[in-house]
Amino acid sequence: MDFQLQATDNNARAGLLNLAHSQVATPVFMPVGTQGCIKSLDATDMQGILGAKLILANTYHLYLRPGEKVVEELGGLHRFAQFHGSFLTDSGGFQAFSLSDNVKLQEDGIVFKSHIDGSKHLFTPAKVLDIQYSLNSDIMMVLDDLVGLPAPLKRLEESIKRSAKWANLSLEYHKQKNRPNNNLFAIIQGGTHLKMRSLSVGLTHEGFDGYAIGGLAVGESADEMLETIAHTAPLLPKDKPRYLMGVGTPENILDAIGLGVDMFDCVMPTRNARNATLFTHSGKISIKNAPYKLDDTPIEENCACYTCKRYSKAYLHHLFRAKELTYARLASLHNLHFYLELVKNARNAILEKRFLSFKKEFLKKYHSRSH
């Protein structure tokens, strides 16, 4: 993997991430395709309509169903899903904790029961890499010990030491495999405790292809999250991509870009779409509300997305009320277009040294109304 830093504007960064299946301009937002697809969308929607170059899939879910060996036998995740861009896969540790009963944390890994059939499984640092090799992920995340917030200091310290140990074991294992197209990212933990974040960075070896800031958006305040990012991002190697996991709102993303983060993922645009919330530059709207029943205008004037060029708010209101499956697709296409355009415009602003004014102007309009 090759990462080229093209421009900076204060702490904001614009770069190019060269992966085996695509070249990705950063900052980048990665749509979340947990099961190997973005809910309600297919590869043609993602590539031909949205132009997405990098999407996220979930190791835990694909391991349990259909099984990584099935995906491997069918040509890997790209051929299986017919997505010819790149895939980042997370390690599955978070899902093992959040979806399973009777999770047991051990020094060598995580023992969990499948949420599908109750069968028992062990995720170790090597095991989750083997799964991701079978999937043929472009970017693989290491297994980590995620802690919900707030958490006692002792538990945070235990988490970062275990996460760093697992990351370093993963790096050594990966070096033996000679798989240059499968890139490995470390994950920095430590909650909102700044000394713990510094310790986590210090314990994690150099030599990873990228570094993620994990363990945020799990119960802390927005101010705590931003303070943690502001502290952690400058500690990470300047020549490697920085990934903020699971974040977030348009405001969160712009704030984090301004603090030096390059990569983002979140279910928000698609989950909100399915629940009737649509993003516009003037704030969010709830398409299920009565005023849209006779509204013959698009979700947003001047929006170039597939949905806005073809359909009215009245039609989307009708589809949502009628519980039609097509609603989820049209709404998701709009919200993902909004997010992808947001980071694209942020990138252009960084290249032109006007990021702060771009952010200020965007947020002023975005907060002007929500209805």
Curated annotation (Swiss-Prot):
UniProt-listed GO biological process terms: queuosine biosynthetic process; tRNA-guanine transglycosylation
Cofactors (names): Zn(2+)
Superkingdom field: Bacteria
Alphabetical UniProt keywords: Glycosyltransferase, Metal-binding, Queuosine biosynthesis, Transferase, tRNA processing, Zinc
Active site: D90 (proton acceptor), D265 (nucleophile)
Enzyme class: transferase
InterPro entries (alphabetical): TGT, TGT-like_sf, tRNA_ribo_trans-like
GO molecular function: metal ion binding; tRNA-guanosine(34) queuine transglycosylase activity
Protein role: Catalyzes the base-exchange of a guanine (G) residue with the queuine precursor 7-aminomethyl-7-deazaguanine (PreQ1) at position 34 (anticodon wobble position) in tRNAs with GU(N) anticodons (tRNA-Asp, -Asn, -His and -Tyr). Catalysis occurs through a double-displacement mechanism. The nucleophile active site attacks the C1' of nucleotide 34 to detach the guanine base from the RNA, forming a covalent enzyme-RNA intermediate. The proton acceptor active site deprotonates the incoming PreQ1, allowing a nucleophilic attack on the C1' of the ribose to form the product.
Assembly information from the UniProt record: Homodimer. Within each dimer, one monomer is responsible for RNA recognition and catalysis, while the other monomer binds to the replacement base PreQ1.
Official protein name in the record: Queuine tRNA-ribosyltransferase
